A protein has these predicted regions:
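Active-site loop signature of alpha/beta-hydrolase-fold enzymes
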Residues: 8-9, 34-37, 101, 199, ...
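Conserved loop-alpha-helix segment in the C-terminal half of the alpha/beta-hydrolase fold
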Residues: 184-225, 230
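Conserved HGGG/HGGXW glycine-rich cap/lid loop of the alpha/beta-hydrolase fold
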Residues: 1-43
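Gly/Ala-rich beta-loop-alpha elbow adjacent to hydrolase catalytic centers
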Residues: 71, 75, 79
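Conserved alpha/beta-hydrolase catalytic His-Asp/Glu region
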Residues: 104-106, 122-183
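Flexible "cap/lid" loop of the alpha/beta hydrolase fold
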Residues: 80-84, 90-124
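Short beta-strand immediately N-terminal to the catalytic nucleophile in serine-hydrolase-like folds
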Residues: 69-71, 96
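Conserved acidic catalytic loop of the alpha/beta-hydrolase fold
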Residues: 49-66
Length: 242
């Protein structure tokens, strides 16, 4: 099961879907308010809302089945939360630069972004944030796509989805709260990230012997788009070994 990130949609996985669909039962989700999914009223875009949607989807459409849940960015945190809440539904988690394991210093930056989203134009704020997380090698067409997509989304979705990932009671993306969530996971986890300090910090958090954390240089936040073939090879090899 593939879960995209904040302001994304299932098309983010277009470079993975042909291979994954040829090897596995594959479900690519548009999260609420994103892509072709229903736009919910304001106040309905907290992490627990997204987790509840995926839990209901599996229970209704795939009862009794387990998934390897692959999440990018916000989707990585949703995958981890679902695995903690319903390990009977999740056999493993792949987090591609997931919203997990950030330092308290980064948490302060994210808090400022959440404030800017609340008081400013969320499409502009999101686009400015994206510019900070690309690699020099990132294709300009990807940058344009990400920016235009965010600017075309409902403002409430963009504003309300970001902050609770990193700020306030119940956040699980920063500091000790993120460590607590990750340490609670009993399923194998493969976390791919770009920051070597984050990779070192997170490695001791996962108890399953098949878990691992890798640092991926020469890629921006959308690692699976910047290094398509490498990610496909690494993720499928890990899934097959699990």
């Amino acid at each position: 099961m593939l879960l995209h990130g904040w302001t994304g949609d299932s098309h983010d996985w277009s470079w993975q879907l042909p291979l994954f669909e040829s090897r596995y039962r594959t479900v690519a989700v548009d999260l609420r308010g994103h892509g072709r999914s229903e736009i919910m009223p304001p106040g309905c875009y907290r992490p627990d809302d997204y987790v509840a949607d995926i839990e209901a989807l599996i229970a209704t459409e795939y009862p009794g089945q387990e998934f390897v849940v692959v999440g990018h960015s916000m989707g990585g945190q949703i995958a981890a939360r679902l695995a903690a809440r319903r390990p009977d539904m999740v056999s493993a988690v792949v987090s591609i630069d997931g919203a997990l394991g950030f330092s308290d210093e980064m948490g302060e930056r994210f808090a400022k972004t959440a404030h800017d989203l609340a008081v400013g134009d969320p499409g502009v704020v999101a686009s400015a944030l994206f510019q900070q997380v690309y690699d020099p090698s990132t294709d300009p067409a990807f940058k344009l796509w990400h920016r235009r997509r965010a600017q075309g989304m409902p403002a409430d979705v963009v504003r309300e989805s970001f902050g609770p990932l990193f700020v306030g009671d119940g956040q699980a993306g920063v500091g000790a709260a993120s460590a607590s969530l990750c340490r609670s996971l009993k399923v194998p986890v493969y976390h791919l990230c770009r920051d070597p300090a984050q990779a070192d910090r997170m490695r001791p958090w996962f108890s399953h012997p098949k878990s691992k954390v890798d640092r991926w240089p020469h890629a921006g936040h959308w690692i699976m788009q910047d290094r398509q073939e490498d990610v496909n090879a690494a993720v499928t090899a890990w899934i097959d070994a699990v």
